[in-house]
Amino acid sequence: GSNYTLVGMIPGDSSYQQGNSNIPTEVGGLYVYIGLNGSVAAASGAATAGTATATFAVGDILGWAFDAENGTLQCYKNGVSQGTQFTNIRTDIGWVFCVTDYDNSATATYVINFGQRAFAYTAPSNYKALCTAALSDPTIADGSTAFDTKVWSGNSTYPRSITGLNFSPDLIWLKNRTSAYDHVLMDAIRGTGTTKWLSSNLTSAEGVNYANANVTSLDANGFTIGSTAGTDILNQSGTATVGWAWDGGTSNTTIAAGSLNSSVYNQSAVWSGMCSPAPSSGTYVQGFDGNLTSVFASGISAGSYFTFTPTGGLTFSNSVRVYMGNVSGASYQYNGGTTGSLPINSWTTVATGGGTMTSLGVTRNVLDVHGWFAIEVDGKLLVDSDVTPPNVPSIPSTVRANPSAGFSIVKWTGTGSAATVAHGIAAPKFIITKSLANATNWVTGHDSIGWGNFLFLDTTDAQGASAAVWNNTAPDSNVFSVASSSYINPAGSDVIAYCFSPVEQYSSFGSYLGNGSADGPFVFTGFRPRFVMTKASSASGLWNLHDTERSNSNPASKLLWADSSSQEVDYAGGDFTIDCLSNGFKARASTSSLNSSGVTYIYIAFASHPFKTARAR
């Protein structure tokens, strides 16, 4: 029959189904009509169609070179370029390769090589095969070297050593699976023993329930459980227990107030002396004092610029950013050319990739022109050399950090007022905190809900909003912020924090939107999960704890909950279940605590293997 073969791409979330006579453009995609005349077409808004290709016959080899970053597509026939078939391809969505016979009238076999074997023709320069072998090598090749899960059966024999970890654990989180006993958390900063454990399902202060659990040591490849005066909730005969463990580095470090100033500020000059014209309200020093709430203003006409002209130019290797506070209608001009708006209360990147800044001007479209609140070059605020900026961090802390695994343990004494605390890793996306001496809630922060909001780990509550918790400030690569809340920063009392930053192909912290179906949303993590914790953030819901040690095949159905002492429940394909896949996880139930339609859920996940080496299970 006639050859009506179409080769194309469709959006990753498309409803396209082979055999239903749909062509890619009907579902927001694009195609090349290789079987008939080589014509090209794209759905409205999907791409701009360009050069047609030659016609392909049986035995011809089509090359498909898609540049997802720049939104271009070039085809090759038997190794010869056919020009550029598409430009301006949407870069804000995922794309899936597809091939179809337009009218389903022909019987055809398509052999597609995504890199599983050698190509017949050399791929264009800077293009990679669409297969996991082409992925970059992961920082952590084996997730069990930084995080792992262990299970054991109690035997009421002491001391009981739990071994088999590939690291010395610095945080352990333990839960009896058989009985409704409390969770137990211990770490290398606070130490071990009956008076040192905390429970994620209780507001109790440290060690209040000391008689029921006793971890006597954190060892080279595990930990040791000791005897107790009360009911042993960790090694009782006839019960099963699970333990999750993280590697937090090798030693505790005291980080003094102000000890990170040189990492945060560039004080190599009096920058305020390199600006013009003079403002009538305030001085240029307010743009170079390290304070993001002060600003200079007025004295120039609307549309005129306050301009910073660094002597000899200021070279940079990464980026230049400007902070604009609570002032609307401001804009910038960089090096006398590039212009752009400056949204209120936010940083705006004005240059990237390296270069020399010779001038930076800020203006406003009204007479009351305001200047910049701060300028940052290569991650450091420009601060006058004769100014004393705020200390970073503002208070001291004890930190045990494993930057390569994106995990740290932090302990500090609360101040009862706004403060910054050092954490020792890349900017955390998830933080768990607990006041040690007070019966208060566990407070968590998650990047997906914003740092003006919080969740309690020990309750099912939806997210709450309060500037008194994280001071409406996202963590950066040096510190996280706390405010006046007695939950997180009680004056004179110690607080512990567990901080997590994402490491590509090892850990992921994000969110997904529920669809209310057993065919739930897929969440890409970039690895096969070993551990997944989920929680409804926009509505009430449980903190679900999954791992592939307890559920070693899909669906992962054996559930515990961080906010509950309940024993493990095996839902065997029903409520709460997920599939753990080679590159993420997928909700397989519509229960309200996992996948209600229209509800937003946060997740925290750690890898068994990176996507590059993960295989189907």
Regions found by a protein language model. Give the residues of each.
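Extracellular carbohydrate recognition and processing domains
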Residues: 338-354
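A short beta-strand element within beta-rich, extracytoplasmic domains
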Residues: 1, 174, 291, 299-327, ...
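Short acidic/polar inter-strand loop motif in beta-rich domains
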Residues: 367-370
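Disordered, acidic Ser/Thr/Pro-rich linker "stalks" and the adjacent N-terminal cap
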Residues: 18-22, 258-311, 334
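Surface-exposed molecular-recognition determinants
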Residues: 2-3, 9-268, 272, 291, ...
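Extracellular ligand-binding interfaces
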Residues: 323-342
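Extracellular beta-strand-rich recognition modules
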Residues: 320-324, 358-365, 587
